[in-house]
Amino acid sequence: MAAVSARRMLLPLSLVIAVHAAAGAQGAAPTQTTPSGATAAWTLRMKGDIRWQQVTPAGALLVSTDAALSAVDIERGQVTWEKPELGGLPPDSVRMVGGSLLMEAARPGLLLIFDPVTGSVVFDSRRLNLAQIVTRRVLPQSGTLLVHGRRTPGGGPPVVALYDLATGAQRWANEALFEQTEPQKKGLGGLMQRLVTAASEATALEVLQAGPDMIVVHTLTGLRALDARTGVMRWSATLPTARAGNPARHVRLYPSLDKTDRIYVSFDDRLMAYRLADGQALWTKPPTIEGWVHGIVQHPSGIIILPESPPANQATGNVRIINGVVQTGLNVARYEDGTTIVDKPLRMRGTVTDAMIAGGSAVLAVDAESRTFVNVLDVATATLRLKKDVKIKGQLAYAELTPAGLLYISRPDPATNAEVNVIDLASGEPKFKDAIESGKPWGGNPDDYNAARYSLHHAVEGTTLYVFASHDHRLYAVDRNAGTFRALGGEIKLQGDEDPVDMEIRPAGLVLIAPQNLVVVARDGQVKQQVYYPAPQLPGLLRALHRLNAVRAGLYGAAASAYGDAFAQASRNATDTTTRRLTGQLATAYTQGGAQLQGYASQSAALATKRFKASLATPGSVFMLTRAPDGNGNVLLQIDKDSAQPRSRVDLGKEREPVYAVDDIAGMLFLRTAPGTLVGYRL
């Protein structure tokens, strides 16, 4: 599946489900076996016509009727709660709250955030008379939800409030967070103070969960640490900007991965470490770079400070502009005192979007002039291993240093396709004269469910990197040590004008998965099994299947956030191979260490933890939706990845647009069989 870009943590492809659509097999297919009908586990009659339904990351099934929004226990088939005030909402008005198990429902004048398992309302915008929600952040370590909002005109000052995740009780509300901590100035200085305060009230807070007892926030008026239980300010700090008194811009907060006594704060062109206990700066002065700070990477040999190219009219200092791009400079700071390993920042062409850790080095991805360049940074010496940056197609997605050099895979962007190649570190030249390439560039639509078809799908087994290239529809094997590649077998053409959206290694061979195709390929490139199921005529029918990946991603985000802010930031930010270590640590903590998704109601935490453990197993099947054999209605098939045969099937009836939902973690399908009747099938 197309990997979700994050800077420090990429969930392994084995943990991200490939879900797709397609029944009535055609084309090059093996002898078909008759799938067994799915077993109806329960039947439930709702109060009113069922409009839509959706599975939540926590495991509850939300069902909407004109009368109410209800939750159904998927194991027992029983309604666990109802909310009449949320009846008749369109499906897009009920959404997951990122990095949590919670859901939110919105309608004009109302925002509700609730626990889908217990039905507890954690936040109701009417309680504080809020007209606008500026910031909302779930903090599972302290079991809270932080909300920052602005009231209706005349309704009072902006407020920051904290709510208990389990009960919805308000722990505290703070209306003084945006007040100036400096003495009140007169004249122009006072005007500037008031302007900064007004802007701060309308700007989303930077929030960091610093353990179970402390929350650190940044507003335009400064850095504040709040007691998570009472909301009392423990300490405040003013960021040391280049010109004293100027508010810091582009502020980001980072947890320390290895030193629990501190946090890191980047702002403008600099970085500072602060002691959590009292907010004291741990370094004499902040290390600086050229450009804005885009992010940091905490490498064992130092903190890599990634630069971002500012707009030319906002650049400060000694500005260098080439071809309309403001040039930048990267540096590496020491953990002990913040001093930089080299005096002058290393010159970069533009924004360094990523630094993928590879042993003692980091592979840099640089965005300049709408093109991507790569280089290799030796972190301990803060030097570049390539004499000049190497331009690649697309955007960097995967990189590793091998005996042959820098092996990389890119992903397509709106203008360029993707490629696989190896860069010789001595010469700086690519080893493959004709790189392995994908087909068309990605169209640029983030809502395109089939965007993954434009990527180069790959899988590693031992010293071999398998790559499927949609450019010529062939499977390639790259020797990671020798830096060579060869084509395996002949062209693998999918039917229905499709390309694979995922590939994985299984005992039977390599499996190529597309919305309506599944192909099992031997390791020598020979096709063992291939099936194709024509798509239903209405694309909207596939929405429930496309949602499966979002549900899994939501569950992983909640697990990462509950385990710690370092994992939460990693899951939000990154794309590199070092994140396998973090992901493995996270999985081990929940499966062997007995960790729970803390902070939520016990019932919700237990159910979500059980689902998270179950989700770690790579699914052995995919779901495909297709037209019924007689052409009247639709059928959902569960296709085995190893045999390419249907395991089970469910007839979705004769409706043009059946109302159904699938939970691949629990192995269930939920179908409206009559206007007010819901049936749960065990697959």
Predicted regions and their residues:
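N-terminal secretory signal peptides that target proteins for export/translocation
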Residues: 1-6
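Bacterial N-terminal signal peptides
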Residues: 8-20
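Secretory-pathway ectodomains
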Residues: 25-683
